[in-house]
Every structure is written in structure tokens, then in C-alpha cells.
């Protein structure tokens, strides 16, 4: 069920990150070299999850793997145990919680009308649901972490933290962000652009769906422009 996916991606997955933050308090902050294998594993896991997103044909699976890839960056930033790293991890967890939940909501909106989650079968929806296409564009831009979104702030803090710790990590981080932009663009173009493959008429988006997306993106934009609301 889509409600379970939204709660899992927005809350339960982030509780794991919060648990790691609490657990790291019992370890000395000066021995980050001890955690080198875990940091490399977290970054490598983020890249593998992003590569898995590129080969997904199921819309829901693509969004789920996207959430996992972002948590790899969060875990790497937490393990380094610096103020910037913790701030970036918290910012990215909050921002991506809203973003992934919004994407799952949009995926369900598409599924209710097409009865399929296969990307190639849901193309051309901008002809039938132009307002939903706007929501898709905003959610994907947040997923890519464009400035001045909270996603961008979190990823920038994480990037700075990992680069100061080891400049070589910029290669893995840059590759991860490049793949994230690639599959986000692929997801948007596959579901919204191109010729319509659905023969029957679909009903337009309802007010409840617009309200649901507004309740996802308005708090995210408020936090992006006024981050002291959560600090």
C-alpha cells in the first residue's frame, strides 16, 4: 500500500539515521580513521543504489532505491562526527523525507489512472494531467537537490564534510550526484513526456491530491528558505 511506502521512506528509514547519530555518541570523535571501511561502504552503497535506480522499470521501486541511496550519504556524514556533518545529515533526512513521500504519492496518483507502474507504459501524462506534471517536476527538482532547496543545503554540508575529511571522496560523491540527476530526469521524462499510450480517458487530478502535494512541498520550501524553523 502506498501509505506504508510513504511512512517507510519519510519516517522509518530516517529513524535508522537518527539511531546511528545516537549510537555514534559513545565512540571517540578523534578516531574517524577506524570507521574508514564503513564510510567507504556507505558511499559505495549509495552509488550502487543509484545505479540500480537507472535500470529500474518499476516506478515505485525506483523511488524506493532513491531513498536508500540518499541514506548512504547520510550515514557517511554521521560517522565522521563533525558539526557540519551532523547538520547536513539532519537537513538531508528531513528534506528527503518530504521529497520521497511526495514522489510515492505522485506514483500512486499515476497508478490509480493507468493501473500500472511500468515507466514506459505511463508516458505522456502531461497531456492528460498537466497540473500533476508540475508537481512531478517540483518533486524531481527537489530530489536532484537544486538550490536553494533544503536538499541542496544538506548535500552541500555533507560534501564539504567528506571533502575536508578526505578529498578523494569527491569522486564518489560527484558520481553519486550525477547518477541521481540522471535517473531523476529519466523518471520525469518517462512518465510525463512522449506520446500517450493509454487509450481510455483518465479522470483529472482531484483537489485532495493537490492538497496532499501542497502539504508535502510547502513545508519543504518553508524549511529551505527559513531553516531556523527546525533548528
From Swiss-Prot:
Keywords noted in UniProt: Electron transport, Membrane, Mitochondrion, NAD, Respiratory chain, Translocase, Transmembrane, Transmembrane helix, Transport, Ubiquinone
Subcellular location: Mitochondrion membrane
The enzyme's E.C. designation: 7.1.1.2
Catalytic activity: a ubiquinone + NADH + 5 H(+)(in) = a ubiquinol + NAD(+) + 4 H(+)(out)
Transmembrane segments: 1-21, 34-54, 63-85, 89-111, 128-148, 169-189, 211-231
Cysteine disulfide links: none
GO terms under cellular component: mitochondrial membrane
Membrane-protein topology: Multi-pass membrane protein
Domain of life: Eukaryota
First-listed, main subcellular location of the protein, grouped into a coarse class: mitochondrion
MF GO annotations: NADH dehydrogenase (ubiquinone) activity; ubiquinone binding
GO process annotations (BP): ATP synthesis coupled electron transport; electron transport coupled proton transport
Family: Belongs to the complex I subunit 4 family.
PANTHER family: NADH-UBIQUINONE OXIDOREDUCTASE CHAIN 4
Role description: Core subunit of the mitochondrial membrane respiratory chain NADH dehydrogenase (Complex I) that is believed to belong to the minimal assembly required for catalysis. Complex I functions in the transfer of electrons from NADH to the respiratory chain. The immediate electron acceptor for the enzyme is believed to be ubiquinone.
Protein name: NADH-ubiquinone oxidoreductase chain 4
Gene symbol of the encoding locus: MT-ND4
Amino acid at each position: 500500500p502506498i501509505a506504508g511506502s510513504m511512512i517507510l521512506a519519510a519516517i522509518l528509514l530516517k529513524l535508522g539515521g537518527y539511531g546511528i547519530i545516537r549510537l555514534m555518541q559513545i565512540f571517540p570523535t578523534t578516531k574517524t580513521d577506524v570507521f574508514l571501511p564503513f564510510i567507504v561502504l556507505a558511499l559505495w552503497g549509495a552509488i550502487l543504489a543509484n545505479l540500480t535506480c537507472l535500470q529500474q522499470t518499476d516506478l515505485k521501486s525506483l523511488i524506493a532505491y532513491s531513498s536508500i541511496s540518499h541514506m548512504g550519504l547520510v550515514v557517511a556524514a554521521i560517522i565522521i562526527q563533525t558539526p557540519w556533518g551532523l547538520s547536513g545529515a539532519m537537513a538531508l533526512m528531513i528534506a528527503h523525507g518530504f521529497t520521497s513521500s511526495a514522489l510515492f504519492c505522485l506514483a500512486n496518483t499515476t497508478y490509480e489512472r493507468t493501473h500500472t507502474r511500468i515507466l514506459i507504459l505511463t508516458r505522456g501524462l502531461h497531456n492528460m494531467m498537466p497540473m500533476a506534471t508540475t508537481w512531478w517536476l517540483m518533486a524531481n527538482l527537489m530530489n536532484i537537490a537544486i538550490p536553494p532547496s533544503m536538499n541542496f543545503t544538506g548535500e552541500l554540508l555533507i560534501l564539504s564534510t567528506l571533502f575536508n575529511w578526505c578529498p578523494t571522496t569527491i569522486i564518489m560523491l560527484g558520481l553519486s550526484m550525477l547518477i541521481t540527476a540522471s535517473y531523476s530526469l529519466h523518471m520525469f521524462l518517462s512518465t510525463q513526456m512522449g506520446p500517450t499510450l493509454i487509450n481510455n480517458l483518465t479522470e483529472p487530478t482531484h483537489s485532495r491530491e493537490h492538497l496532499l502535494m501542497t502539504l508535502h512541498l510547502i513545508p519543504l520550501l518553508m524549511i529551505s528558505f527559513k531553516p531556523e524553523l527546525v533548528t
